[in-house]
């Protein structure tokens, strides 16, 4: 049975009306629409990036192209990203960046502050994420199979050599997975072993909580939003050995968690979602 021509128009208008009603009446629907568009937009930008990046082949300099394409994404959602402490980045030497990991929105803060010749270490599954995976591979992103410990250790040893010989910086999320509970998970020690093995400094970066505008658990994504990205002073690993790694990881996590609580309660990213006795003040760096 064929529909008369006007029926398709009527169905389209009905669908648009339904979507509009869901958008204005359901915060959960708005959350899913926004996240679907966010992920779809990233895949589309990756398609644009692939032919440009392919000219160089797999090259860390291609991260500049991805960053340029992704920097505007915060404006689509009315998210203001404020960066503090960027002067703490060493101007020339290699280093390991460690950052907290809350959601895929971390990409917005990362692109805002990403240093030159810095690539993330990502789970291997991302490599198969369509156009995004290919764009990431062309940008030199390092993929690790977290299920195969032996392979991961081998890759990290190679990365340590790359840091020193090719003047590359790496960005690691030491929690190992996204954390939505308004705190920080215990840190895995791979990034710290890497920094100690290469004898390069660690640069902790903290992104404030998104709870005032985003919550996966509550299916909430509102606009506008504000996020502060705080770059902490370098942590030296000079002279440290693998035996020092557990204490090093705990110390860095403690300093990052302290800053996370401060900047998530000062009205620049977390509203009052994280209460801290005595109030919040400017972090002393």
From Swiss-Prot:
Its EC number is 2.3.1.51. It comes from the Eukaryota. The chain crosses the membrane at residues 35-55, 125-145. It is found in: Endoplasmic reticulum membrane. A motif (HXXXXD motif) lies at residues 101-106. Residues 29-34, 146-189 are lumenal. Widely expressed. It is a multi-pass membrane protein. Converts 1-acyl-sn-glycerol-3-phosphate (lysophosphatidic acid or LPA) into 1,2-diacyl-sn-glycerol-3-phosphate (phosphatidic acid or PA) by incorporating an acyl moiety at the sn-2 position of the glycerol backbone. The HXXXXD motif is essential for acyltransferase activity and may constitute the binding site for the phosphate moiety of the glycerol-3-phosphate. Belongs to the 1-acyl-sn-glycerol-3-phosphate acyltransferase family. This is 1-acyl-sn-glycerol-3-phosphate acyltransferase alpha. It comes from Mus musculus.
């Amino acid at each position: 049975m064929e529909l008369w021509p006007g029926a398709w128009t009527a169905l389209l208008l009905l669908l648009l009306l339904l979507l509009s009603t869901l958008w204005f009446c359901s915060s959960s629907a708005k959350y899913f629409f926004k996240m679907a568009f966010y992920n779809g937009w990233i895949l589309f930008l990756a398609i644009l990036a692939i032919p440009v990046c392919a000219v160089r082949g797999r090259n860390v300099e291609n991260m500049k192209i991805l960053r340029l394409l992704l920097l505007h994404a915060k404006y689509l959602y009315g998210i203001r990203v404020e960066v503090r402490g960027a002067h703490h980045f060493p101007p020339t030497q290699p280093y390991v960046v460690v950052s907290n990991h809350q959601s895929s929105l971390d990409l917005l803060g990362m692109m805002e502050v990403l240093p030159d010749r810095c690539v993330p270490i990502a789970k291997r599954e991302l490599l198969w994420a369509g156009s995004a995976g290919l764009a990431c591979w062309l940008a030199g992103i390092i993929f690790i199979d977290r299920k195969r410990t032996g392979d991961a250790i081998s890759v990290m040893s190679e990365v340590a050599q790359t840091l020193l010989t090719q003047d590359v910086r790496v960005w690691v999320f030491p929690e190992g997975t996204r954390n939505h509970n308004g705190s920080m998970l215990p840190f895995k020690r791979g990034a710290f072993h890497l920094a100690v093995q290469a004898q390069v400094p660690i640069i902790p970066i903290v992104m404030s909580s998104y709870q005032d505008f985003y919550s996966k658990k509550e299916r909430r994504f509102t606009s506008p939003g504000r996020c502060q990205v705080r770059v902490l002073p370098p942590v030296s690993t000079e002279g440290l050995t693998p035996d020092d790694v557990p204490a090093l990881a705990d110390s860095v996590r403690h300093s990052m968690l302290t800053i996370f609580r401060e900047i998530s309660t000062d009205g620049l990213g977390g509203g009052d979602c994280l209460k801290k006795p005595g109030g919040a003040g400017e972090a002393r760096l």
